[in-house]
Amino acid sequence: MPKKILFTGGGTVGHVTLNLILIPKFIKDGWEVHYIGDKNGIEHIEIEKSGLDVTFHAIATGKLRRYFSWQNLADVFKVALGLLQSLFIVAKLRPQALFSKGGFVSVPPVVAAKLLGKPVFIHESDRSMGLANKIAYKFATTMYTTFEQEDQLSKVKHLGAVTKVFKDANQMPESTQLEAVKEYFSRDLKTLLFIGGSAGAHVFNQFISDHPELKQRYNIINITGDPHLNELSSHLYRVDYVTDLYQPLIAMADLVVTRGGSNTLFELLAMAKLHLIVPLGKEASRGDQLENATYFEKRGYAKQLQEPDLTLHNFDQAMADLFEHQADYEATMLATKEIQSPDFFYDLLRADISSAIKEK
């Protein structure tokens, strides 16, 4: 009988990416892989799109809020139902372990696995824990973290960032689509790539639309999240979504303008790619992106510009400063010790699962 592992995590792409890195490795080693999530969530879309041999189990989900809302009353019942569904799934499958990447959907499966005596491993990417992982930590066997955490968190293993980016641009798959884009770009201009993520692309889209003069100063690549904006014209490539082109576009850019999500930031760090961070503020997030951006700026990896300050004048100043000190930023990024390979983390996780099973 094959070993079984349950994955969970969702709500944003960032809560799915690491799972999609690990899952093929478990499948290759003969594990039967199952995933618990929201059937209407990004996790279901990404699992389906991956084509991986994964059985998806849908549960009811409710948002966990730090503030009062009448929706909390309805969501209490959704979370309770999700817990009952998770208990049934875990009891039926009897997996060796559960791995969670976080997000609201992950809490019921984590609690269910713990109640049924299954080892629970969770991962936190941000400088500070989100509410879902604060709850999940209480039920976890081990929590792996990208950033160092408080000393009193005894179950934490500081890992660093796990990425699968190609550091060598020559390793990346060739793309006829990319060659077509280059035909519209000028070799005399710097190329900027704007990555807004699922929650933050709109501001970048509007900034580019409001300032057509940017196209006279730079080649612009804009990942918009909106298919209605798709365009390929002189000095401008707007595309709603990319997969295979993602890393080649980063490699093609001289500088990346990004939000403050930790997954993207550490991918840029791994590629030693010059970048400007415009983090989501507390009105659009819990403040984790502000913390991530400040961390990267203090480490000398990047420069940050707050969203309310995103004017053309301030943007031009930030570009000038980054390009003037490009060599210093790149040298600092190349010297980082904060990046781990997927194989390293997979081996560590497998070893920890084995140890947890033996200790039961």
Swiss-Prot record:
Gene3D superfamilies, sorted: Glycogen Phosphorylase B (3.40.50.2000)
E.C. code: 2.4.1.227
Chief location bin: membrane
A Gene Ontology cellular-component term: plasma membrane
Binding locations of UDP-N-acetyl-alpha-D-glucosamine: 198, 289
Gene Ontology molecular function terms on file: undecaprenyldiphospho-muramoylpentapeptide beta-N-acetylglucosaminyltransferase activity
Keywords tagged on the record: Cell cycle, Cell division, Cell membrane, Cell shape, Cell wall biogenesis/degradation, Glycosyltransferase, Membrane, Peptidoglycan synthesis, Transferase
Highest taxon of the lineage: Bacteria
Keyword Cell membrane attached: yes
Entry's localization field: Cell membrane
Pathway membership, UniProt: Cell wall biogenesis; peptidoglycan biosynthesis
Catalytic activity, as annotated: Mur2Ac(oyl-L-Ala-gamma-D-Glu-L-Lys-D-Ala-D-Ala)-di-trans,octa-cis-undecaprenyl diphosphate + UDP-N-acetyl-alpha-D-glucosamine = beta-D-GlcNAc-(1->4)-Mur2Ac(oyl-L-Ala-gamma-D-Glu-L-Lys-D-Ala-D-Ala)-di-trans,octa-cis-undecaprenyl diphosphate + UDP + H(+)
GO biological process, one term: peptidoglycan biosynthetic process
Bilayer topology annotation: Peripheral membrane protein
Protein's job: Cell wall formation. Catalyzes the transfer of a GlcNAc subunit on undecaprenyl-pyrophosphoryl-MurNAc-pentapeptide (lipid intermediate I) to form undecaprenyl-pyrophosphoryl-MurNAc-(pentapeptide)GlcNAc (lipid intermediate II).
Family: Belongs to the glycosyltransferase 28 family. MurG subfamily.
Name of the molecule in the record: UDP-N-acetylglucosamine--N-acetylmuramyl-(pentapeptide) pyrophosphoryl-undecaprenol N-acetylglucosamine transferase
Species whose genome carries this gene: Streptococcus pyogenes serotype M3 (strain ATCC BAA-595 / MGAS315)
Gene: murG
